[in-house]
Amino acid sequence: MQLLNLSLFFLLPFATANPIPQDSQNIIPGQYIVTLKDGLTTAEIDAHKTWLAFTHRSNIAAKGHSGIESEGVFKHFQIHKLNMYAAGLDKKTVEELRRSPHVKSVLPDQKIYLAEAVTQSNAGWNLGYMSSKGQPSPSWSTLTNYTYDSTAGEGVWAYVLDTGVNVNHVEFEGRAILGRNSIPNRPHEDTFGHGTYVGGIIAGKTYGVAKKATVVSAKAFDGGSSSYRYILDSYEWIVKNITDSDRKSKSVINLSISGAKYQPFDEAIENAFQAGITTVVASGNDGRDASQNTPASSPNAITVGALRWENTRPGFSNYGKVVDLFAPGELIRSGWTGGNNATRVASGTSAASPHVAGLVAYLMSIETLSSPSEVTARVLNLTIPGLVKDARGSPNKVAYNGIQEML
C-alpha cells in the first residue's frame, strides 16, 4: 500500500519547521503529531504547553472552528528522551507551532496499516524451517520437525502492538494478558484476528517459536488501519511497562505493521532502543525497497522480510539494505478470531516478523543478552547466509534458532 512519503529533516534553533509534501489521501485532516526538540527542560516543556493551550484557544475563538481542529492536545508522549504529542489543531496554530523555538517538527497524522496477512490453503512448514538451517526440502510438507530448547521463551514477555489478542485462545494456555487498549470506546478484544495470529506465531503452544513466553496485548488497531495517535499511545505504554517492570533484557516488541516513512515513529523506536528495549518489525508487503517504509526503515529495529519454503522471496515482501534478515512468511498457520480454537493459514511479512520476535524471546530465555545491540548481534550471528533467491540487495540471511550447534 502506498502511504505518505516523508523525508528526514533537521531544524536549527528558532528556524521554521517547514512541512514536507505528503500523499493527501492518507493524511488525517486536522490531526497532527508534534515532536519537541531534544534537551528541553521540564520548565520549557511546561511553558510550551501553556503557550500552546492559550494560542489554540485564541485562534479557535477568533475563527469559530469546530470538530477535530478545536480539540487541542489529545495526549502527550514521552519515550525515553523523546517528547511529542498528538493534537487536533487549526491551520493558524500549526503555522505558529512551526515557528516555535521548542518544536522540532509538526506533521499531519497519517494512516498506518497492518502488514496484513493473505489467507492461503493448508500449510505448516515454518517451524521446522526455523530449526533446520534453512535448507530446502523436496516438499514444504516434509519440514515438520521443529527442534528447540525446552526453555522455549519461559520468563520472557512478548508485546504485540496490533488489533488485540484473544487471551483465551487455547494456543496461549493462559500465557496471554491484556495490556493497553488505545482505541477509545472499543473493547480490548481482537475482532479482526491479526493480533491473535501474530501472537500465536510468537508464543503459541502449537504454532509458536517461543512456546512458553508470555504475550502482552497492546491494541492500537480496530481493523486494517490506524493512526499514529493510537500507535504512539500503545508504544509509549509498552516502553513504560517494560521499564517500570525492570525486564528490558526479557522483553521484545513486535510490530507487524507498515506505512510510508514517518520520522516521528522512527524516532520513538530509536529512543526505545537507546532505553534498552528490542523492537522487531515487518519489512512490509509492497514489493519495494523497505527504506521507503516505517517502521521497516527504523535503523535500530530488527527488520524482517518474508521467505518461502524453497528459499525464495515472495514478490510481496519488501527488500533492500534496511532488511536485516528473512524468516518464513508464506503459508503460515496460527491462531485467529472466531473462537478459542480458531486458526488461519496466511502469508505476509506480518507472519515473518513474529517468527523473529519469537526467536528473540527464545534466545533471551536461554542466553544472557543484556541490550538490544547484543540481541540483534546474536540473532544475526545465528543466521544462515546465502540461501535467499532474489534477495534484491537485502542482506542474504535467514533466521535460525541455532539448535543444531547446541545439541
From Swiss-Prot:
<feature type="active site" description="Charge relay system">
    <location>
        <position position="162"/>
    </location>
</feature>
<feature type="glycosylation site" description="N-linked (GlcNAc...) asparagine">
    <location>
        <position position="341"/>
    </location>
</feature>
<dbReference type="Pfam" id="PF05922">
    <property type="entry name" value="Inhibitor_I9"/>
</dbReference>
<dbReference type="InterPro" id="IPR034193">
    <property type="entry name" value="PCSK9_ProteinaseK-like"/>
</dbReference>
<protein>
    <recommendedName>
        <fullName>Subtilisin-like protease CPC735_013710</fullName>
        <ecNumber>3.4.21.-</ecNumber>
    </recommendedName>
</protein>
<dbReference type="InterPro" id="IPR022398">
    <property type="entry name" value="Peptidase_S8_His-AS"/>
</dbReference>
<keyword id="KW-0325">Glycoprotein</keyword>
<dbReference type="InterPro" id="IPR000209">
    <property type="entry name" value="Peptidase_S8/S53_dom"/>
</dbReference>
<feature type="active site" description="Charge relay system">
    <location>
        <position position="350"/>
    </location>
</feature>
<dbReference type="Pfam" id="PF00082">
    <property type="entry name" value="Peptidase_S8"/>
</dbReference>
<keyword id="KW-0964">Secreted</keyword>
<dbReference type="InterPro" id="IPR015500">
    <property type="entry name" value="Peptidase_S8_subtilisin-rel"/>
</dbReference>
<dbReference type="InterPro" id="IPR010259">
    <property type="entry name" value="S8pro/Inhibitor_I9"/>
</dbReference>
<feature type="signal peptide">
    <location>
        <begin position="1"/>
        <end position="17"/>
    </location>
</feature>
<dbReference type="InterPro" id="IPR050131">
    <property type="entry name" value="Peptidase_S8_subtilisin-like"/>
</dbReference>
<dbReference type="GO" id="GO:0004252">
    <property type="term" value="F:serine-type endopeptidase activity"/>
</dbReference>
<keyword id="KW-0843">Virulence</keyword>
<keyword id="KW-0865">Zymogen</keyword>
<dbReference type="InterPro" id="IPR023828">
    <property type="entry name" value="Peptidase_S8_Ser-AS"/>
</dbReference>
<comment type="function">
    <text>Secreted subtilisin-like serine protease with keratinolytic activity that contributes to pathogenicity.</text>
</comment>
<feature type="domain" description="Peptidase S8">
    <location>
        <begin position="124"/>
        <end position="407"/>
    </location>
</feature>
<keyword id="KW-0720">Serine protease</keyword>
<dbReference type="InterPro" id="IPR023827">
    <property type="entry name" value="Peptidase_S8_Asp-AS"/>
</dbReference>
<keyword id="KW-0645">Protease</keyword>
<dbReference type="GO" id="GO:0006508">
    <property type="term" value="P:proteolysis"/>
</dbReference>
<feature type="glycosylation site" description="N-linked (GlcNAc...) asparagine">
    <location>
        <position position="145"/>
    </location>
</feature>
<feature type="glycosylation site" description="N-linked (GlcNAc...) asparagine">
    <location>
        <position position="381"/>
    </location>
</feature>
<feature type="domain" description="Inhibitor I9">
    <location>
        <begin position="31"/>
        <end position="114"/>
    </location>
</feature>
<dbReference type="InterPro" id="IPR036852">
    <property type="entry name" value="Peptidase_S8/S53_dom_sf"/>
</dbReference>
<keyword id="KW-0732">Signal</keyword>
<feature type="glycosylation site" description="N-linked (GlcNAc...) asparagine">
    <location>
        <position position="254"/>
    </location>
</feature>
<keyword id="KW-0378">Hydrolase</keyword>
<feature type="propeptide">
    <location>
        <begin position="18"/>
        <end position="115"/>
    </location>
</feature>
<feature type="glycosylation site" description="N-linked (GlcNAc...) asparagine">
    <location>
        <position position="241"/>
    </location>
</feature>
<dbReference type="GO" id="GO:0005576">
    <property type="term" value="C:extracellular region"/>
</dbReference>
<comment type="similarity">
    <text>Belongs to the peptidase S8 family.</text>
</comment>
<dbReference type="InterPro" id="IPR037045">
    <property type="entry name" value="S8pro/Inhibitor_I9_sf"/>
</dbReference>
<feature type="active site" description="Charge relay system">
    <location>
        <position position="194"/>
    </location>
</feature>
